[in-house]
Swiss-Prot record:
This is WD repeat-containing protein CG11141. Residues 283-307, 612-635, 685-710 are annotated as: Disordered. The keyword ATP-binding does not apply. WD repeats lie at residues 31-70, 133-172. One of its GO terms (cellular component) is cytoplasm. The modification Phosphoserine is found at residue 553. Residues 613-624, 694-704 have a biased composition (Polar residues). SUPFAM superfamilies: WD40 repeat-like. GO terms for biological process: protein exit from endoplasmic reticulum. The lineage of its organism: Eukaryota, Metazoa, Ecdysozoa, Arthropoda, Hexapoda. It comes from the Eukaryota. Keywords: Phosphoprotein, Repeat, WD repeat.
């Protein structure tokens, strides 16, 4: 049996954040995302199984920190989950639609069989689905010890037995019991099945000869009210029949045998009102509403509340009945049960509450694995209560609460040490010498102080610390300390604060430009790495301007262009180019070598936008109705148009074979430049009288004509 010292060391050592963080907070259901909530929990020494309202069982490995998803056939709420450690891990999950999904998970080979591991073939997870037997929500399920049989019960009182054949991969299900009320809890011991309903508790045994189930009611008195009390088999036996304990109204228990004979009645009404042996500390307890002017310690609080209770009231009990029952560490005398928001560890032999956890907000489900108690407090809150902290795995970090007092050491327990003690070896003495040390000052002890005041109990110390945190939580702080809002100017850079506050997750030496938006930010420069190899964010303007010279300095610009010219000449094997301003003599020499163009030729080119434009329609104010040959008409084959009726000019064609030389007639008064291009002199004054353009060719074949590419 577990000693009282071991029970007094039960506490919540660290939050299970590593487990909860691996479960997604939201899940896509149809077109809209929804929150993912946990509904039930079960545990073994190596794994945790957590059901959810999305039809997924989360299978968490406590040694490696890995998380797997076991999906049911239908994505509906999982109401109960049970795990058995047999040849393989068997996980049963009851759903709200009446289906039961069974998952068969292969075990890993032990370390001494690592040589055989490459020869074996890992099998995938297999799923069996039980349909059409449960018509409503499955309330509970229970495995046999070898994992070959599964018993499941629903809210209509139907109990179904499922037998599994792992070799043939078959399952056979049959209905064995139909009660009138909801099944609360199931317990299996050898060939006996203990069924606890809202109305009564019965024992079922299968006859090997007739294959019929014999039903026996526990006790002769029926319940006067419908309560959801559980029942469980004990390990001890009398006359080759297992013993059982079942709950009764009014915080009572019946201890009976498999034949239904009640041996004794255990009442815990007075024991619950008394102060428990140990109050389990919780990291984030719920603040209890207390009477005004009451400052409590562990002893004064219990005595005050016990004396102030009226007749028929129960102290901390939210309801006057216990719920499901489990054995603590396999001991028959220690029961773990709960009500709405309080967890109890009861001692049946001493009629005493060994430990109690009162700081829970709500208990959705709980399970017991040896000396560990896992409590599902909320939709995403899982607590672990144990005398020792969780052993570290490959990914999780062990977080101890420094505010909690150290637990009482359990002497003689094999779990009292997480690691083997370090063996100290004597070091060889290099040289004998005398060590000098300073004596501490001698302090006088006051022997008149009583022992009760000098030694503070762990429970009193814990309550005192909880009172300090409660007072801190009730203090009224300014909201601006927690939530600050400030507006930064767009035109001015942010001023550096001298207070020394560093924002978590940001670098303090990062350069921020005020006129840079998010679209122009770059992750890092391709040519520059800062912060010891880490890329610092730069904006595009700063990334390019840091390599450019000052545009306002002519000297710097001239040097930069000269270097560029030398580099280009070296790459292209060109003679070296010297960039320098031209002198007046060189400028006059260049102007002297440039041929002078006559003034009439210069006037041929248009100098204004109106002169260079092409006219495509008739002009109403035209004074000279002479033909215009440069407004889109072909050079050859010109037709004369009347003054009164003017049409649009057809497409313009030009001879593709121009004369080989260009001639400039100098003897004529009106100098004319002949070329294959249009006469730009006519563009200067379209209303002037021009001579008839001579024909350029006698042939009008299509091979000599092409479109003019303007």
């Amino acid at each position: 049996m577990a000693s009282s010292k071991e029970l007094c060391s039960i506490r919540e050592w660290a939050p299970l954040t590593e487990v909860i963080e691996r479960i997604p907070a939201r899940l896509q259901r149809g077109f809209f995302p929804a929150n993912l909530n946990l509904t039930c929990v079960d545990a073994t020494e190596e794994f945790l199984a957590m059901g959810s309202d999305a039809g997924i069982v989360f299978w968490y490995n406590r040694h490696t920190g890995e998380m797997q998803k076991l999906k049911a056939e239908v994505a509906t709420r999982i109401t109960c989950v049970r795990v058995v450690n047999s040849v393989e891990y068997m996980v049963a999950a009851g759903c709200a639609n009446g289906q039961v999904s069974i998952f068969q998970i292969q075990k890993e080979l032990p370390r001494d069989l690592d040589l055989v591991a490459p020869c074996t073939k890992s099998r995938p997870i297999e799923r069996y689905t039980i349909r059409d037997l449960h018509k409503c929500v499955v309330s509970c399920c229970e495995w046999s010890k070898n994992g070959m049989k599964l018993y499941s019960g629903d809210r209509q009182g139907v109990v179904v037995l499922t037998e599994l054949d792992y070799q043939a991969h078959l399952s056979k299900s049959v209905e064995i019991l139909s009660e009138a009320y909801e099944i609360v809890q199931l317990s299996v011991r050898q060939s006996y099945l203990l069924v606890a309903t809202l109305y009564r508790c019965i024992v079922c045994q299968m006859d090997a000869q007739t294959s019929q189930w014999n039903i026996t009611q526990v006790g002769k008195k029926d319940r006067k009210q419908l309560i959801d009390c559980g029942a469980i088999f004990l390990k001890k036996q009398e006359a080759n029949k297992p013993q059982l304990v079942c709950g009764r109204p009014g915080l009572r228990f019946w201890v009976a045998d498999a034949a239904g004979n009640v041996s004794k009645t255990v009442i815990f009404r007075d024991a619950v009102l008394r102060s428990p042996t140990w109050e389990i500390p919780i990291l984030n307890p719920k603040q209890r509403s207390e009477p005004s002017g009451t400052h409590h310690t562990s002893a004064s609080t219990s005595s005050t509340r016990h004396s102030g209770l009226a007749d028929g009231d129960v102290g901390y009990v939210a309801s006057s009945n216990f719920r499901q029952l489990y054995l603590y560490d396999g001991h028959d005398s220690l029961l773990v049960t709960h009500d709405d928001a309080t967890l109890y560890v009861l001692n049946l032999d001493r009629l005493k509450v060994e430990a109690v956890a009162r700081g829970l907000r709500k208990i959705l489900d709980f399970c017991v694995c040896g000396k560990e108690i896992f409590v599902l407090e909320g939709n995403r809150t899982l607590l672990r209560l144990a005398p020792l902290p969780e052993p570290p795995n490959k990914t999780a970090k062990v977080i101890f609460n420094p505010l909690m007092p150290p637990p009482v050491p359990v002497l003689g327990s094999h779990l009292s040490q997480l690691e083997s003690p370090i063996e100290l070896q004597a070091e060889p003495v290099l040289q004998n010498a005398e060590e000098c040390f300073e004596l501490s000052p001698v302090e006088q002890l006051n022997l008149n102080v009583p022992i009760e005041i000098a030694v503070e109990s762990p429970l009193t110390q814990q309550n005192r610390r909880l009172e300090i945190f409660r007072r801190i939580g009730e203090m009224d702080f300014e909201q601006s300390i927690v939530h600050t809002t400030r507006k930064t100017s767009v035109g001015k850079p942010p001023e550096a604060s001298g207070v020394g506050i560093v924002e978590i997750g940001h670098e303090t030496h990062e350069l921020r430009l005020p006129l840079t938006n998010a679209a122009t930010l770059m992750e890092a420069s391709y040519c520059q790495m800062e912060n010891n190899g880490l890329a610092s964010p730069l904006d595009m303007k700063a990334a390019f301007l840091q390599h450019l010279p000052d545009a306002l300095s002519p000297t710097t610009l001239q040097k930069t262009v000269a270097e560029k010219a030398k580099t280009l000449a070296a790459e292209l094997d060109l003679p070296e180019v010297h960039l320098a301003p031209l002198s007046q003599e060189e400028l006059h020499a260049v102007q002297a070598q440039t041929p002078q163009i006559s003034d009439p030729l210069i006037r041929c080119y248009p100098t204004h936008l109106e002169e260079a434009s092409i006219q495509t329609s008739s002009r109403e104010n035209a004074t000279n109705p002479a033909d215009d040959y440069h407004v889109g008409e072909p050079v050859d084959g010109i037709r004369s148009f009347g003054v009164s009726k003017r049409k649009m000019a057809p497409l313009k064609f030009v001879l593709s074979q121009p004369k080989p030389t260009l001639k400039l007639e100098e003897n004529r008064d009106d100098e004319e430049y002949t070329s294959f291009l249009p006469d730009f002199r006519r563009a200067g004054d379209p209303l002037a009288i021009h001579k008839e353009t001579p024909a350029t060719s006698d042939s009008n074949t299509s091979s000599e004509w092409e479109f003019l590419d303007n």
